[in-house]
Regions:
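Walker A/P-loop-proximal flanking segment of P-loop NTPase domains
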Residues: 1-86
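Short amphipathic alpha-helical segments, especially helix-boundary/capping motifs
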Residues: 32-33, 48-51, 168-172, 211-213
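P-loop NTPase nucleotide-binding core
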Residues: 55-57, 61-209, 219-220
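Walker B catalytic acidic pair
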Residues: 214-218
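Conserved ATPase-coupling elements of RecA-like P-loop NTPase cores
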Residues: 220-230
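Loop-centered beta-sheet repeat module
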Residues: 230-237
Length: 237
């Protein structure tokens, strides 16, 4: 009986959809034949590698179908082909999947990229964007500190506090969106400037940069006016 209980426990945990298999895991089963006959390494990996300009790819599927596992395989595939990959699951630290909007995701991506790549490129364009809006945002970061008095590391920490409050303090969430949303175009502009500089300073064994944002499918559908958050995130922007 004990052995049966242990077996059931192991089986139950083996099928946990919230714990993807790492690339190269011996438990991986190739379900390509019954999942659309498309290999993510060929469909997305080669497209990313061969494109002469920046591309944006959407990888979708049913919950628990193995998307995260496939994306981790894609990460390993790209890294083996001279690509520097930044991978993160958006719902782990930055967004509340029960209430997520485009602005939340943009801020989450900005924070993650700043923290991951700050030593490889010049983050000043993004930090200057934050500095220009700090008087309007510092109360939402729950701080009275003047950003001009901080070094780069502390400035990035303040940006992280702002994004953390999007997830942790629901009563501030809509106010943060309302103050940031008019400036999303300029934030994207300075973020691209930062990434352009990063791409010039990649490690010697890398010649491309890829960003993989996972778990956006866990966002709950929200309709605000005429458009849903899905349409805003995946179509409009």
């Amino acid at each position: 009986m004990t052995n049966n209980s242990e077996l059931l426990k192991n089986l139950y945990n083996a099928f946990n959809p919230f714990q993807p298999l790492p690339a190269g895991d011996p438990n991986y089963v190739d379900c390509q034949a019954v999942r659309g006959d498309a290999d993510i390494l060929e469909e997305l990996g080669n497209r990313i590698q061969l494109a002469s300009q920046n591309t944006c790819q959407l990888y979708s599927g049913h919950r628990g179908a193995g998307k995260s596992t496939e994306l981790l395989r894609l990460k390993e595939y790209l890294e083996a082909r001279q690509c520097y990959v930044v991978y993160f699951a958006a719902d782990e630290e930055d967004i509340d999947s029960e209430d997520a909007q485009y602005t939340d995701i943009l801020l989450a991506c900005t924070r993650r990229l700043l923290q991951e790549l700050r030593t490889m490129g010049n983050p000043k364009p993004v930090l200057n964007w934050l500095k220009d809006r700090w008087q309007d945002l510092k109360d939402l970061a729950l701080t009275e500190i003047q950003i001009e008095d901080m070094n780069v590391e502390l400035q990035i920490c303040q940006f992280a506090k702002l994004t953390a409050n999007l997830r942790a303090v629901p009563e501030l969430r809509q106010e943060i969106r309302e103050r940031v949303n008019p400036h999303t175009v300029t934030l994207i502009k300075v973020l691209n400037e930062f990434l352009t500089d990063v791409k010039k300073r990649l490690p010697a064994n890398c010649n491309q940069l890829a960003v993989i944002v996972d778990n956006l499918d866990r966002m709950v559908l929200v309709k605000d006016g005429e458009r849903t958050n899905y349409e805003e995130v995946f179509l409009d922007r």
